[in-house]
């Protein structure tokens, strides 16, 4: 590419919704390494982290927090970096252009911009706008704190973390999201994990990493190339481990010799169905301990017991269930207590 061609375009790496948290802690170093390798091989003009770098609002877990800070530090040493404050980065979902988030100390670093207000950025004579999460219905209001509509129309791309009208969130189609005129600039947004174009000028690259076992969303990061009258994007699959769910009975699991193996490319969660006493017994076995050592996530699903229901019905009271609850509480087993509560909630 000639120097003239480089001057007439801007390339951006957009990283959507990483959601660093305790549950994906072991995968974060691999995630970071893959992104840094891509940046080293494919230089860009700047990087945008599209919000929700952390997951738990105002509750901070030390390990994911340290990994997030290190990730930003690694990015900014390579390229100018903009980090949008997502709703999960704020203390709650009602924040409107506030500094009530965990990233304020990072504002003192060079070559990184923490976007908790509307930010304008010019690169190769092209203008970009970056907007943090704001509650649905207030996106245009937020932009107008810095730009008039005439100025907005001169912008090439608006980067956001927002729910827009018509976007799909699983089986739900947004009816409360912000409406964005089709003759306004292109928006590239985080917040919605499903990759999609709800309209011609709104692009959701989707979340960069799978966040839950069984989630079917395709996870990529996007390298964007913006020219005067063109927009191109390359969706890059990081090939992170696939998180899958397998269902079976406690009896099946207790036999051992599962045909599922955790690898660098695939991890499993086992959902075991059975009765409370089966779960309690299984948790004391060598098979259960081995599953945990091999990295399996294990959860239990109580199989309704007709005997318990008939006793409760015949007595015409909750005496039996009261006794059951008391016995479970005396075990001091938090998982067993959780299972008992789930069982009682079934009626």
Curated annotation (Swiss-Prot):
Coiled coil: none annotated. Keywords: Hydrolase, Metal-binding. Gene3D superfamilies: 3.60.21.10. Transmembrane segments: none annotated. A divalent metal cation 2 binds at residues 52, 87. A divalent metal cation 1 binds at residues 52, 211. Its EC number is 3.1.-.-. It comes from the Viruses. It is an enzyme of class 3 (hydrolase). The keyword Metal-binding applies. One of its GO terms (molecular function) is hydrolase activity. The keyword Hydrolase applies. InterPro entries: Calcineurin-like_PHP_ApaH, DNA_Repair-Maintenance_Comp, Metallo-depent_PP-like. Belongs to the metallophosphoesterase superfamily. IIV-6 244L family. This is Putative phosphoesterase 078R. It comes from Invertebrate iridescent virus 3.
């Amino acid at each position: 590419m000639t120097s003239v061609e480089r001057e007439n375009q801007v390339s951006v790496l957009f990283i959507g919704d990483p959601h660093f948290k305790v549950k994906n802690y072991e995968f974060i170093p691999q995630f970071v390494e893959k992104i840094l390798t891509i940046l080293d091989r494919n230089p860009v003009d700047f990087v945008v982290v599209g919000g929700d770098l952390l997951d738990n609002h105002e509750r901070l877990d030390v390990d994911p927090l340290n990994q997030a800070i290190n990730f930003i530090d690694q990015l900014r040493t390579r390229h100018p970096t903009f980090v949008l404050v997502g709703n999960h980065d704020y203390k709650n979902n009602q924040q409107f252009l506030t500094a009530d988030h965990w990233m304020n100390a990072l504002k003192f670093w060079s070559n990184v911009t923490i976007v908790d207000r509307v930010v304008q950025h010019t690169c190769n004579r092209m203008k970009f706008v970056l907007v943090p999460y704001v509650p649905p219905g207030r996106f245009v209001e937020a932009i107008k704190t810095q730009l008039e509509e005439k100025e907005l129309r001169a912008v090439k791309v608006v980067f956001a973390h927002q729910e827009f009208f018509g976007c799909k969130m699983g089986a739900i189609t947004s009816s409360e999201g912000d409406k964005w005129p089709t003759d306004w600039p292109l928006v590239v947004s985080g917040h919605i994990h499903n990759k999609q174009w709800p309209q011609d000028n709104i692009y959701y690259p989707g979340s960069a990493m799978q966040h839950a076992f069984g989630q079917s969303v395709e996870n990529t990061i996007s390298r964007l190339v913006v020219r005067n009258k063109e927009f191109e994007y390359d969706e890059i699959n990081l090939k992170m481990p696939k998180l899958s769910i397998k269902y079976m009975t406690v009896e099946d699991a207790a036999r051992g010799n599962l045909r599922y193996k955790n690898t660098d490319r695939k991890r499993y969660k086992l959902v075991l169905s059975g009765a409370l006493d089966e779960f309690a017994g299984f948790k004391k076995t060598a098979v259960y301990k081995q599953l945990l050592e091999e990295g399996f996530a294990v959860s239990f699903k109580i199989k309704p017991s007709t005997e318990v229901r008939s006793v409760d019905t015949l007595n015409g009271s909750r005496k039996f269930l009261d006794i059951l609850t008391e016995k479970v509480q005396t075990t001091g087993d938090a998982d067993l207590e959780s299972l008992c509560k789930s069982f009682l909630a079934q009626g």
